[in-house]
Amino acid sequence: MRKVVVIPTYWARKKSDGWQEGDAVYDHPTPLDEDGTLQRTLESMKPLKYKDFKLVLPICPTTPDIADEAEQRVIEIIRRADLKAETYVFTVGDLERVSNIVYETDTQHRTTPLLTMMGYANVRNICLLCADILAADAAILIDDDEVFEKSDWIERSIEFLGKRIYGDVVYGMAGYYINKHDQYYDDVKAEPWMTYWDRFGFKAKAFDEIIGCPPRVKRTPFAFGGAMILHRDLFQSVPFDPHITRGEDIDYVINSRMYGFTFFLDNTLSIKHLPVPKKHPQWKRIREDIYRFVYERAKIVSQYKTSNMVIVTPEDFDPYPGEFLRDDLDEKIFRSNMMLAADYMLQGDSEGCAESLNNISISRKDAMPGFDPFSRYRLNQKLWEQISEAVALKRYDMRKIMEEHNLSKTPIVRNAQRERQLQPAEIITELRKAFDFELSDDDWLKLSKLFIVETYYEDEMVFRSGDFNDAMHILLKGELLLFAGSRDSGGEVELTHLVKGDILGESCMTHTPFTLNCRALQFTEMIGIKRDDIQTLVNSDPALGVKFYQQILVKVVEKMRNNNIQSLSMGGGTVLDTFIDGEA
């Protein structure tokens, strides 16, 4: 199962500059002149047993003005953490380029408004997008203020994903937070105004029922955005609702249920949550809750029967968040804010008192969506599926954009071996050995000019599972190993060795990812031709291009016949299948 761990990281202007009008509002974005909590999170991943995942860090600045500086700060922190995992950063600029590709495939030009890094729900969608581009089977969502304390957390997180439990397939799995006291309860102090707004009390009840009791895995009405594991069938179909301002994680559970996906929680999958203390006043925090619950209730109330969807009720999400999605929500808001206003008045805080009373008015006016939230979400879901289709169609081009920010690429060391240039005559000699067809001298020369020399040192990775097959190569010297698995995940399974004269990647025209890994066992030299250059040749010189293409097909058939690859089973298919499909 291909795993992509995604950790969005939020950045703000320097502390001395402060928040400015138009900046996005997040709980605790890291000022540019501070380090924040990201390095702590990355360093906590070092003891993980298996690092056979790709790690992506979407960089979310509160304003485009600081995007470049934020990128440099994140890269500095990643370098310092020195986590031995394949790591990417994903920037606002990367998103813009990916959006342009989506835009080109979307003739109605409707999908790109979903592709933005402003707001929590939108950021979560970008996390899913990154996982999709990297061909993930499992998207593992983590936050940058968490600490891993279990070395087997990653393999635990996907243990049940895609499997059937109690009649349902597990498409969404939730872990849970523990606080600095190693408890799963919210670290808050009860106050009188909470009598009518007992959110933490109902959360505690839900946590006790789902987290605190057996069995290990059970259906859940809630999930945590920083400990959420999604199967590709779910994240390619169901987006986070861009209109939810807060609580996008639990809202995602509601949306998923509407589309027939059930979330489960694993009560052994804990992760320590150590957020920076919130500085917002209490009236503002309850206002954020008002907006989310009023919106979610409106979405539930506005449901209507439609094909392939499930009508959900507040009771489906009891005790939390269901208790705050009922008809008495308005009464809860009124009573709790009246008491909060009284508390502020006793403290002599007239502003806090006025804002608390204003919450009541907001709940009846501004918080009410001015549109049908159910129909709007259905529209966004359809647009999200179009984005997923665009990714499937243009994954190669999008992946190239992400690879530009792959921080784990082995730097190419330039020396005499690396810089050796082959003369056209040498390349033609190798091509004549590899391919059995008659060409004129001019055609051989034309073909040779499309090939480039590539070299790899001993133990250097040539490609990894999930990388795209974008070229065909002929080995001139050295030896390559094709294998499944990894050193971190309990061992490599050697499948075959390639030596001088062997051809690698002859199925590159199928435009699909590898499911195997390839590493150089000694210094290896190859000549290769890109799939784009093959296509250009077919278009510019059809006679030569078709001849060459036929030779590629011959090589595929020869590999099928002569190498007995059928006997090597791989994930329900065979290694032969992967060669045919362009994945090896």
Regions found by a protein language model. Name each.
Residues 209-229:
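A recurrent flexible, glycine/aromatic-enriched loop bordering the glycosyltransferase active site
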Residues 414-458, 508:
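Cyclic nucleotide-binding regulatory module and flanking cytosolic helices
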Residues 52, 288-417:
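Terminal low-complexity segments of carbohydrate-biosynthetic enzymes
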Residues 168-192:
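Short beta-strand-to-loop element that shapes/binds the nucleotide-sugar donor at the catalytic cleft/hinge
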Residues 21-53, 76-80:
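Short, acidic, metal-binding catalytic loop of nucleotide-sugar glycosyltransferases
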Residues 70-134:
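Active-site-proximal specificity loops/subdomain of glycosyltransferases
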Residues 245-252:
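Acidic donor-binding loop at a coil-to-helix junction in glycosyltransferase catalytic cores
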Residues 443, 493-550:
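Cyclic-nucleotide recognition modules
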